[in-house]
Amino acid sequence: MNFTKLFVVFAVVLVAFAGQSEAGWRKRVFKPVEKFGQRVRDAGVQGIAIAQQGANVLATARGGPPQQG
């Protein structure tokens, strides 16, 4: 019985402190990772656009219609 009460009190205290904690270390660790992911995404989108333009130029040079994308 005492163990159950102790466990409940410990769980409540743990939730109270965990819920109010600041995300300082997580922010320091994951912010650069998030920025890196955004740069990779943006570079991929830009690379696809450049490849599509190159395909359009090639198709125009060959005399066909440009590719739709």
From Swiss-Prot:
Give the modified residues of type Glutamine amide. Answer: 68
| Source organism | Hermetia illucens (Black soldier fly)
- Look up the record and give one Gene Ontology term from the biological process aspect: innate immune response
Tell me the leader sequence span: 1-23
Q: Where are the transmembrane segments?
A: none
Q: Can you name this protein? A: Cecropin-like peptide 1
Statement: the UniProt record of this protein carries the keyword Cytoplasm: no
Say which family it is in: Belongs to the cecropin family.
The compartments listed are: Secreted
Q: What does this protein do?
A: Antimicrobial peptide active against Gram-negative bacteria E.coli KCCM 11234 (MIC<=1.03 uM), E.aerogenes KCCM 12177 (MIC<=2.07 uM) and P.aeruginosa KCCM 11328 (MIC<=2.07 uM). Not active against various Gram-positive bacteria at concentrations up to 4.14 uM.
